Amino acid sequence: MEAPGSGGGDGGGDPGGDGAHPDARGPVSGPCAAARDSERQLRLRLCVLNEILGTERDYVGTLRFLQSAFLQRIRQNVADSVEKGLTEENVKVLFSNIEDILEVHKDFLAALEYCLHPEPQSQHELGNVFLKFKDKFCVYEEYCSNHEKALRLLVELNKVPAVRAFLLSCMLLGGRKTTDIPLEGYLLSPIQRICKYPLLLKELAKRTPGKHPDHTAVQSALQAMKTVCSNINETKRQMEKLEALEQLQSHIEGWEGSNLTDICTELLLQGNLLKISAGNIQERAFFLFDNLLVYCKRKSRVTGSKKSTKRTKSINGSLYIFRGRINTEVMEVENVEDGTADYHSNGYTVTNGWKIHNTAKNKWFVCMAKTAEEKQKWLDALIREREQRESLKLGMERDAYVMIAEKGEKLYHMMMSKKVNLIKDRRRKLSTVPKCFLGNEFVAWLLEIGEISKTEEGVNLGQALLENGIIHHVSDKHQFKNEQVMYRFRYDDGTYKARSELEDIMSKGVRLYCRLHSLYAPVIKDRDYHLKTYKSVVPGSKLVDWLLAQGDCQTREEAVALGVGLCNNGFMHHVLEKSEFKDESQYFRFHADEEMEGTSSKNKQLRNDFKLVENILAKRLLIPPQEDDYGFDLEEKNKAVVVKSVQRGSLAEMAGLQAGRKIYSINEDLVFLRPFSEVETILNQFFCSRRPLRLLVATKAKETIKVPDHPEALSFQIRGTAPPCVFAVGRGSEAVAAGLCAGQCILKVNGTSVANDGALEVLEHFQAFRNHREEALGLYQWVYHSHEDAQLARASQGAPDEDPQEDDQPDSALPLLSLGPQLSLHEDSAVVSLTLDNVHLEHGVVYEYMSTAGAKCHVLEKIVEPRGCFRLAAKILEAFAVDDSIFVQNCGRLMAMSSAIVTMSHYEFHNICDTKLESIGQRIACYQEFAAQLKSRVSPPFKQASLEPHPLCGLDFCPTNCHVNLMEVSYPKTTPSVGRSFSIRFGRKPSLIGLDPEQGLNPMAYTQHCITTMAAPSWKCSPAVDEDSQGQGLNDSSYGSASGAPSQQDRGLSFLLKQEDREIQDAYLQLFTKLDVALKEMKQYVTQINRLLSTITEPTSAAPAPCDPSLVEETSSSPPVSEESEVDRTDHSGIKKVCFKVSEDEQEDSGHDTMSYRDSYSECNSNRDSVLSYTSVRSNSSYLGSDEMGSGDELPCDMRIPSDKQDKLHGCLEHLFNQVDSIHALLKGPVMSRAFEETRHFPMKHSWQEFKQKEECTVRGRNLIQISIQEDPWNLPSSIRTLVDNIQQYVEDGKNQLLLALLKCTDTELQLRRDAVFCQALVAAVCTFSEQLLAALDYRYNNNGEYEESSRDASRKWLEQVAATGVLLHWQSLLAPASVKEERTMLEDIWVTLSELDNVTFSFKQLDENSVANTNVFYHIEGSRQALKVVFYLDGFHFSRLPSRLEGGASLRLHTVLFTKALESVEGPPPPGNQAAEELQQEINAQSLEKVQQYYRKLRAFYLERSNLPTDAGATAVKIDQLIRPINALDELYRLMKTFVHPKAGAAGSLGAGLIPVSSELCYRLGACQITMCGTGMQRSTLSVSLEQAAILARSHGLLPKCVMQATDIMRKQGPRVEILAKNLRIKDPMPQGAPRLYQLCQPPVDGDL
């Protein structure tokens, strides 16, 4: 046995290979060599003895740790442990008989130490110790057989946060680092140890010469321990793995470094690859283990000697010579495109290859596989190994931090209580140190309360709190010590930053990356060092300087800590070696830059980090549940989920679902990537909860269908021209079954083009139409494309009494038309072939990536043309036309009243007014015409960019290139990370999207993000030459020679409209509207008083008419006004706060739902010193029945006013007088004074002084009412009527004056332009908000994903937030006003226009419409320009999910902000116009930041008010975490925005374009609706969205930091936004020269680049 044993030892132990032959020629080599060999063997034997003793001591220490840290603590806190779920049975299962094992090993260690006393020597004997204890080692049988059960239980317990935290705290107090080895690692150590003994004894036997006294005992001990292990199944399996590793290592000659069995558990992959390094290309055998990659040279067979033949009997019959090893922790892998030949491949052309970078030594080499399949196998294995390692580490770090933070929070609250009084101000030398505690007092207190059981645990806990940033030494000089050293909680000195080095580092890192790459004077750039160029690097000290200059960090130490955090979390690394970040001149590089350098778009898909899965073209269908099912069945066909059948007449068929269509997603779940069984389960779950379905169904842009040509009746309606469109289809008809849907455009009939024809030309091809032209339509329930179409159809039906018939018809008609046999009757009938153009298609791309947590995430990115935007623009134009018509009528009436022209100035004034009124009349006619154009427009469903000026048309009121960019992210919900890491380590991987046998479907997280891109709203119209008179007149008035056309077109509205003029015009309009509403409300109070008096005075004959008709009827002169137009001064609850109650029957028309322009009436109670002060004193007697009445004999003597009626009368009269006071205040104000001044040349009844004196009439009227109350109640109604008549006349005079002033200051030439730009902006805003609203109502919106908040909670929170604080609309402009004249004009236009959006309000109503398919929302416009109200009609399901305030009718306020930054440098001396352009941008940004700050304050108050902190300390910590972290992030972003908007002197140029990503993140976190604009809506805005989406994925969805730019690049060049370029082929929109690096990296390739 000696020869092979020692031979094996030589091969493994002599790196030089010199000792490979001595035994073979032993007799000849002489005594000297033999002695040398013997001495070497004994030296190695001593090493093995030391290892056995050392590892045994460590093992006993581990067992003691498990006993003291876990078992003893659990026993000390029995009640607490049971409450958390650690029952006695659970503890027994987890730890089994580990204490018995400890007792055995204490004795075993004592015996080993006795044998090897005082220090191990090579002559010591050890074999007998093992033989003595071999029977006692049977104690392992129970432990090993229970082990699998224990691990299963641990996974379940780890799902309970309280248990997970308790187990982590046990580990912490025991002094072990919680992130090193998880508990399951410790529980595995007994099995690993018992399996290790045979390996150690085998090594000892090798090194024990035959003549050694211990030789026989060691051989016996080896066999005995093998027998012990083979008797236990679990250890047998473990032994086999370890033996395989040991055997493999024994076949590698010259092995260096630690043994495989010490650091690895299994071989993952092996194979031969070509390795290119240092100019050589060689074949090498590679072995990939967990944690290690080894490569060897194959040793050629040596023939001749007996020993050599034996040594060739190994793996694959060959031997290896060790050539190198790389710890996978410091190894990076990079794919290489086929055909590449570069520096690392030494000029060799690479095929099926990849690069491996040993970052510890900064050495690169290239590997090449024989085939592409083999390459993929290696890359997959390398990535799997990396993900297992990273997810384990990240998960453990996150869990440990949570536990320590919660523990710190709990202890802090306890220490702050008066009983404990540990935290206090303390004296030190001559100073006082505020709010601190002493280390030794802290440890003593922890012992006293039972938090720890011994002093060491207290020190461990203190050190953990210090390392995790919860406490610190008051001078930051000491670690935690159990001494009289002062420490302070960071909460008390404001230095606590929650989790900044863990999760928040992700968003901080992404933010820093974007800012650094947005600089015009880059900090990150290519740098030369020692004749080598390092690409995209930054010296550590330069980065520290920059962080300090920007205010991100206050000290260099803090900046270094941030740099270390960035390196530790995969953002950047040292370019040469794996060293920590230092404040030195060493170079560091962002991983994301490495991913981008030297790559072309072709090799992106081979990367395993972020890859494209599928391109889709689809249509979104909305299918509500029916009584029994959804009306369709699915099947699996070619691994795709396909519609098997659709029920005739079902809601699914009505939505346009057809058999054979592929389904991509159901309610945002990407079912096409799931097994079919799971898809059925998902459908059942949705049906059980009665949820409507949102299906994404594959479709084509154009398709040809065959519609049966029945001679009896048509089952569809066609309208419109060029192209004709399907107006409606009959539900359940054969046309629907054939695939005809409302809204489709008809391009061809039977192969003949009809795209430029009308509906009649299409219908002529159908027999039914030719036979019965007038009555060709069948009896169907019609399904329309939009609600407007449905309304139009109802209106054209004629008399209203026919409507019920229409509803009855379908019920009787449907059975006839839906019968199956009817199909067979017409089997041979003719068909008409229709080629159709589908509208509202969604272009999408599906991507996937592995997140930092090791989960597979899927992203569906889509662009959607906003539905109904043309019709919405038409409705806005109609509202403007109505507004203008009323204005023209009122002004016309006024002009007619004053026909006498006295002076020349009167004549001029009259003439100007006439001209303006004529111009407004032409505008009204145009708006009506444009509205009709837009309503009939169907295709294309969006407006393309146009660079040339053109005659004004309806499309000029619609946004250009407006697309909603949706990003839907889905991934499995995270399980507790310890459990997750367990399943990865031990091979029980849960399916990422699949069925868990214990839980049914794995729960998934779904989130939808929405950003709109568009061209900035603009005015690009030229005066028409050949228009009709109306259009000509309009254009003449807009661009008349007097108006100076060139200057108007060259400059924007903010330049042309003076701020003062805009303000005074708005003031006039607001006053006009306020007067109108105040008068209306006053009349409603009068109505209530009259009604009240009529119920008190029984004899109706004697009572006066309760209410004069003139008081109630609406005056025709008052424009229809949104009664909530000035929302900031209204009470949003929808019910006015009044101080009296009205019965239900009175409520109907009492006007109590009316919203007032004045402040809430709740303060009326404090106004009792008014006219009613006298009556309130006499509240217990009736005025009508009192002795002072004088005419008492006219009344029945028992006439009394009940006390409840008295109170109502008091309230009504008080409100009436308050309203009168309010009207007086409005009429005497400065605005009215200015109006009189402006119109002094127009002859009116009164001057300003005479007008003010009219108030005396109303004072007299009030006195009269007081007298009536006390002396003559019968005349009270007539006194009130007199007062109201006076007030009404007073108000009418005031309104007339305002109308004249308005007419004078209205610039009719600019109003058209304002309307066009405003209309474009409002349409985009409404469509964006509506998409985000629907996402929130479907519980898919989540702007808080990085704080692990569920989409359901985030959506509900956002809905409550907007209901309380309004909607933040964030417009981001990338226009270049300094270099492009047109873009400066655009910016000046939209600055004015967006401020006007704040006057718009949104409200909600329920939609009771079932004759329109695939529409959740439709819009209605009410009000005037100054108080426009958009009403969102929502279907019942979504309406029921609105916050109760919005359901009740309250309106939402808009807060519009515009941040603008040109993507071009402003370095150097500016050209003349540039300075003004830069100042314009700064002014816009400053105003917007102020508005954002106001909104943030409201939001902060809203959340803090709702966050009543729980009493439980653990729950408090979580709650504070959820609140403080987002607030900290918002504070930081706001600070950054201030540095961009108000830069220090001379620093403006050094800030770059960082404002763009920072403002996006700030508004995203505030829950804003985001709209990004550039000159055309094509290039800059779409790239900005790709960047923002990649940043969101990294911040909230675990995209690896190194993949941020890679993801941006793929989404930009291969994502759905390339469709926008395809739709605008002739439009050029290049990126500005000198754009920052961030915006140049991902530009689409120029022609010829690829």
From Swiss-Prot:
Superkingdom, taxonomy of origin: Eukaryota
UniProt xrefs under SUPFAM superfamilies: DBL homology domain (DH-domain), PDZ domain-like, PH domain-like, Winged helix' DNA-binding domain
Annotated Polar residues bias: 1030-1047
Record field: compositional bias (Gly residues): 1-19
Domain DEP: 416-491, 518-592
Region of interest called Disordered, as start-end residue ranges on this chain: 1-33, 793-813, 1022-1047, 1099-1129
Residue numbers carrying Phosphoserine: 314, 991, 1186, 1191
Molecular-function GO terms, alphabetical: guanyl-nucleotide exchange factor activity; phospholipid binding
Any Pfam family: RhoGEF
GO CC annotations, alphabetized: cytosol; dendritic shaft; growth cone; perinuclear region of cytoplasm; plasma membrane
Domain PDZ: from-to ranges: 620-698
Keywords recorded for this protein, A-Z: Cell membrane, Cytoplasm, Guanine-nucleotide releasing factor, Membrane, Phosphoprotein, Repeat
Main function: Functions as a RAC guanine nucleotide exchange factor (GEF), which activates the Rac proteins by exchanging bound GDP for free GTP. Its activity is synergistically activated by phosphatidylinositol 3,4,5-trisphosphate and the beta gamma subunits of heterotrimeric G protein. May function downstream of heterotrimeric G proteins in neutrophils.
Summary of subunit composition and partner proteins: Interacts preferentially with RAC2. Interacts with RAC1. Interacts with AUTS2.
Name of the featured protein: Phosphatidylinositol 3,4,5-trisphosphate-dependent Rac exchanger 1 protein
Primary gene name: Prex1
